[in-house]
Amino acid sequence: MSSQKTIESTTPNLPTPYYLIDEQAIVNNLTIIKRICDLSGAKALLALKCFATWGVFDAMKPYLHGTTSSSLNEVRLGAEKFGGETHAYSVAYAEHEIYDVVSHADKFVFNCFSQLNVFRHVADDKGIAIGLRVNPITS
């Protein structure tokens, strides 16, 4: 019989479903990413669209420069729970959301020239850096 512990044997009363996250595996991967950043001068951001489990943000913060977000709620989560740089990007923003998004962001990346033309003044008024996503084939 194996002496290896199973999840069931170590956490028999945990309600299900639940997420089991191996923080050490995350830290191991982030250590590699941080080393690449240190050697290259690049910055690494956590994309909240793919991983927004704020319960492990404290373990991740030392290795990343901040977050990138594609909605108002993600921008707020990054600013309030992760810290560091907060980048905002979305293919579309509702006009009533744009002021809230910009109030939580350090950088705003516009999806197209028309979005830039309509909302640039909001980012400029806030004094945050801006960017423009360019897709030469379809933009």
Predicted regions and their residues:
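Short, flexible segments with low predicted structural confidence
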Residues: K5, S9, L30-I32, C50
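Active-site anion-handling motifs in enzyme catalytic cores
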Residues: A25
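Short hydrophobic/aromatic segments of transmembrane alpha-helices and their interfaces
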Residues: E8-T10, I36, A59, I98-Y99
